[in-house]
Curated annotation (Swiss-Prot):
Keywords, comma-separated and alphabetical: Cell membrane, Glycoprotein, Membrane, Transmembrane, Transmembrane helix
PANTHER family: CASP-LIKE PROTEIN 4A3, CASP-LIKE PROTEIN 4A4
GO cellular component, as recorded: plasma membrane
Record region (Disordered): 1-26
Species lineage: Eukaryota, Viridiplantae, Streptophyta, Embryophyta, Bryophyta
Protein name: CASP-like protein UU2
Residue positions with a glycan: 90
Family listed: Belongs to the Casparian strip membrane proteins (CASP) family.
Main localization (coarse): membrane
Pfam families hit by this protein: CASP_dom
Protein backbone atom coordinates (compact mmCIF):
# COMPACT_ATOMS: atom_id res chain seq x y z
CA UNK A 1 0.00 0.00 0.00
CA UNK A 2 1.38 3.39 -1.02
CA UNK A 3 2.17 6.05 1.54
CA UNK A 4 -0.87 8.44 1.66
CA UNK A 5 1.51 11.32 2.36
CA UNK A 6 3.29 10.84 -0.90
CA UNK A 7 1.03 13.21 -2.83
CA UNK A 8 1.27 15.82 -0.10
CA UNK A 9 5.03 15.67 -0.15
CA UNK A 10 5.17 15.93 -3.92
CA UNK A 11 5.47 19.14 -5.94
CA UNK A 12 1.72 19.24 -6.61
CA UNK A 13 1.04 21.03 -3.31
CA UNK A 14 3.04 23.82 -1.72
CA UNK A 15 3.44 21.53 1.32
CA UNK A 16 3.27 24.46 3.70
CA UNK A 17 6.34 26.10 2.23
CA UNK A 18 6.71 29.80 2.86
CA UNK A 19 6.44 32.20 -0.02
CA UNK A 20 7.91 35.66 0.03
CA UNK A 21 5.13 38.27 0.23
CA UNK A 22 4.93 40.90 -2.47
CA UNK A 23 3.91 44.48 -1.81
CA UNK A 24 2.51 45.02 -5.27
CA UNK A 25 0.43 42.86 -7.55
CA UNK A 26 1.98 42.18 -10.94
CA UNK A 27 0.95 44.58 -13.66
CA UNK A 28 -1.90 43.36 -15.84
CA UNK A 29 -0.49 44.99 -18.94
CA UNK A 30 3.20 44.95 -19.72
CA UNK A 31 5.12 47.13 -22.12
CA UNK A 32 4.42 46.36 -25.71
CA UNK A 33 1.05 44.77 -24.99
CA UNK A 34 -1.81 45.74 -27.29
CA UNK A 35 -4.29 48.05 -25.48
CA UNK A 36 -7.71 46.56 -24.62
CA UNK A 37 -10.37 46.74 -27.32
CA UNK A 38 -12.66 49.03 -25.33
CA UNK A 39 -9.99 51.77 -25.27
CA UNK A 40 -9.81 51.89 -29.02
CA UNK A 41 -11.94 54.46 -30.79
CA UNK A 42 -12.31 57.07 -28.06
CA UNK A 43 -11.85 59.71 -30.72
CA UNK A 44 -14.65 58.16 -32.73
CA UNK A 45 -17.05 58.67 -29.83
CA UNK A 46 -16.09 62.35 -29.69
CA UNK A 47 -16.61 62.61 -33.44
CA UNK A 48 -20.07 61.09 -33.12
CA UNK A 49 -20.93 63.62 -30.39
CA UNK A 50 -19.90 66.53 -32.61
CA UNK A 51 -21.88 65.17 -35.55
CA UNK A 52 -24.99 64.65 -33.42
CA UNK A 53 -24.60 68.16 -31.98
CA UNK A 54 -24.66 69.61 -35.49
CA UNK A 55 -27.68 67.47 -36.36
CA UNK A 56 -29.44 68.71 -33.22
CA UNK A 57 -28.94 72.36 -34.20
CA UNK A 58 -30.11 71.69 -37.77
CA UNK A 59 -33.26 69.93 -36.52
CA UNK A 60 -34.04 72.84 -34.18
CA UNK A 61 -33.64 75.31 -37.05
CA UNK A 62 -35.86 73.25 -39.34
CA UNK A 63 -38.51 72.91 -36.66
CA UNK A 64 -38.48 76.68 -36.11
CA UNK A 65 -38.83 77.31 -39.84
CA UNK A 66 -41.72 74.86 -40.29
CA UNK A 67 -43.56 76.23 -37.26
CA UNK A 68 -43.14 79.88 -38.27
CA UNK A 69 -44.49 79.21 -41.76
CA UNK A 70 -47.34 77.08 -40.38
CA UNK A 71 -48.30 79.81 -37.91
CA UNK A 72 -48.27 82.41 -40.66
CA UNK A 73 -50.46 80.28 -42.92
CA UNK A 74 -52.97 79.47 -40.17
CA UNK A 75 -53.21 83.08 -38.95
CA UNK A 76 -53.64 84.60 -42.41
CA UNK A 77 -55.80 81.98 -44.10
CA UNK A 78 -59.35 83.02 -44.86
CA UNK A 79 -61.90 82.49 -47.58
CA UNK A 80 -65.18 84.05 -48.66
CA UNK A 81 -68.44 82.28 -49.38
CA UNK A 82 -71.07 84.69 -50.70
CA UNK A 83 -71.13 87.37 -47.97
CA UNK A 84 -69.55 85.24 -45.23
CA UNK A 85 -65.81 85.39 -44.54
CA UNK A 86 -64.36 82.19 -43.12
CA UNK A 87 -61.10 82.14 -41.20
CA UNK A 88 -59.09 79.07 -40.33
CA UNK A 89 -58.84 80.20 -36.70
CA UNK A 90 -62.65 80.05 -36.40
CA UNK A 91 -62.19 76.29 -36.01
CA UNK A 92 -61.31 74.91 -32.57
CA UNK A 93 -59.16 72.26 -34.29
CA UNK A 94 -56.98 74.88 -35.93
CA UNK A 95 -56.88 76.95 -32.74
CA UNK A 96 -55.39 73.95 -30.97
CA UNK A 97 -52.87 73.39 -33.77
CA UNK A 98 -51.96 77.09 -33.69
CA UNK A 99 -51.41 77.04 -29.91
CA UNK A 100 -49.22 73.93 -30.10
CA UNK A 101 -47.13 75.48 -32.86
CA UNK A 102 -46.55 78.56 -30.69
CA UNK A 103 -45.39 76.42 -27.74
CA UNK A 104 -43.07 74.33 -29.93
CA UNK A 105 -41.67 77.46 -31.58
CA UNK A 106 -40.80 79.09 -28.24
CA UNK A 107 -39.27 75.86 -26.94
CA UNK A 108 -37.11 75.34 -30.05
CA UNK A 109 -35.91 78.96 -29.99
CA UNK A 110 -34.83 78.57 -26.34
CA UNK A 111 -33.06 75.28 -27.12
CA UNK A 112 -31.30 76.84 -30.12
CA UNK A 113 -30.11 79.82 -28.05
CA UNK A 114 -28.73 77.48 -25.37
CA UNK A 115 -26.96 75.43 -28.05
CA UNK A 116 -25.34 78.56 -29.53
CA UNK A 117 -24.22 79.73 -26.07
CA UNK A 118 -22.63 76.33 -25.42
CA UNK A 119 -20.85 76.48 -28.78
CA UNK A 120 -19.47 79.97 -28.07
CA UNK A 121 -18.26 78.86 -24.63
CA UNK A 122 -16.69 75.72 -26.04
CA UNK A 123 -19.05 73.40 -24.17
CA UNK A 124 -20.90 70.35 -25.45
CA UNK A 125 -24.10 71.24 -27.29
CA UNK A 126 -25.75 68.03 -26.11
CA UNK A 127 -25.60 67.11 -22.44
CA UNK A 128 -24.33 63.68 -21.48
CA UNK A 129 -26.96 60.96 -22.02
CA UNK A 130 -27.20 60.31 -18.28
CA UNK A 131 -27.22 63.94 -17.09
CA UNK A 132 -30.42 65.61 -15.74
CA UNK A 133 -30.40 68.27 -18.49
CA UNK A 134 -30.46 65.54 -21.13
CA UNK A 135 -33.37 63.80 -19.43
CA UNK A 136 -35.36 67.04 -19.16
CA UNK A 137 -34.76 67.80 -22.85
CA UNK A 138 -35.83 64.29 -23.80
CA UNK A 139 -39.06 64.54 -21.77
CA UNK A 140 -39.91 67.94 -23.28
CA UNK A 141 -39.17 66.71 -26.80
CA UNK A 142 -41.32 63.62 -26.29
CA UNK A 143 -44.22 65.62 -24.83
CA UNK A 144 -44.18 68.17 -27.64
CA UNK A 145 -43.92 65.36 -30.18
CA UNK A 146 -47.21 63.86 -29.01
CA UNK A 147 -48.86 67.28 -28.81
CA UNK A 148 -47.79 68.16 -32.35
CA UNK A 149 -49.02 64.81 -33.62
CA UNK A 150 -52.38 65.43 -31.96
CA UNK A 151 -52.51 68.90 -33.53
CA UNK A 152 -51.68 67.46 -36.93
CA UNK A 153 -54.47 64.91 -36.51
CA UNK A 154 -56.91 67.68 -35.57
CA UNK A 155 -55.96 69.66 -38.68
CA UNK A 156 -56.34 66.63 -40.93
CA UNK A 157 -59.71 65.76 -39.38
CA UNK A 158 -60.96 69.31 -40.00
CA UNK A 159 -59.79 69.27 -43.60
CA UNK A 160 -61.45 65.89 -44.18
CA UNK A 161 -64.78 67.24 -42.91
CA UNK A 162 -64.36 70.38 -45.03
CA UNK A 163 -63.69 68.27 -48.13
CA UNK A 164 -66.93 66.38 -47.48
CA UNK A 165 -68.88 69.59 -46.87
CA UNK A 166 -69.67 68.57 -43.29
CA UNK A 167 -67.88 71.36 -41.43
CA UNK A 168 -70.21 74.26 -42.17
CA UNK A 169 -67.25 76.14 -43.64
CA UNK A 170 -66.32 76.73 -47.25
CA UNK A 171 -66.93 74.02 -49.82
CA UNK A 172 -63.63 72.42 -50.80
CA UNK A 173 -65.00 70.16 -53.50
CA UNK A 174 -63.02 72.20 -56.00
CA UNK A 175 -59.51 73.60 -55.83
CA UNK A 176 -59.28 76.88 -53.94
CA UNK A 177 -56.69 78.80 -51.99
CA UNK A 178 -58.42 78.49 -48.60
CA UNK A 179 -58.48 74.69 -48.60
CA UNK A 180 -54.97 74.47 -50.03
CA UNK A 181 -53.59 76.58 -47.18
CA UNK A 182 -55.39 74.42 -44.62
CA UNK A 183 -53.67 71.35 -46.01
CA UNK A 184 -50.32 73.15 -46.18
CA UNK A 185 -50.50 74.23 -42.52
CA UNK A 186 -51.22 70.65 -41.43
CA UNK A 187 -48.36 69.33 -43.58
CA UNK A 188 -45.91 71.88 -42.14
CA UNK A 189 -46.94 70.91 -38.62
CA UNK A 190 -46.25 67.28 -39.50
CA UNK A 191 -42.74 68.19 -40.69
CA UNK A 192 -42.19 70.03 -37.42
CA UNK A 193 -43.32 66.89 -35.61
CA UNK A 194 -40.75 64.81 -37.51
CA UNK A 195 -37.93 67.19 -36.51
CA UNK A 196 -38.91 67.13 -32.83
CA UNK A 197 -39.29 63.34 -32.87
CA UNK A 198 -35.81 62.89 -34.35
CA UNK A 199 -34.31 65.36 -31.90
CA UNK A 200 -35.87 63.50 -28.96
CA UNK A 201 -33.74 60.44 -29.69
CA UNK A 202 -30.35 62.06 -30.33
CA UNK A 203 -29.03 61.70 -26.78
CA UNK A 204 -30.01 58.05 -26.66
CA UNK A 205 -28.35 57.54 -30.02
CA UNK A 206 -25.20 58.97 -28.42
CA UNK A 207 -25.59 56.49 -25.57
CA UNK A 208 -25.77 53.68 -28.12
CA UNK A 209 -22.55 54.83 -29.79
CA UNK A 210 -20.81 55.07 -26.42
CA UNK A 211 -21.91 51.56 -25.45
CA UNK A 212 -20.77 50.19 -28.81
CA UNK A 213 -17.18 51.35 -28.22
Amino acid sequence: MEDPKGAWQSDVFDNGRDFKPHDKAPANVTAGTTPPMYNVGAGGSEGNSKALSIISIVLRCLSIMFNVVSLGVIASNQGKSYFVVWRTLNSSNMQYLFAINVIVLVYCVVQLILSIINLVQGKMVLSGPTQPASTITYICDQGLTYMLMAGFGAGVALQASVDKGESGMLDCSGANEFCGKNKASAALSFLGFVCIALSANLNYLRLYFMAAK
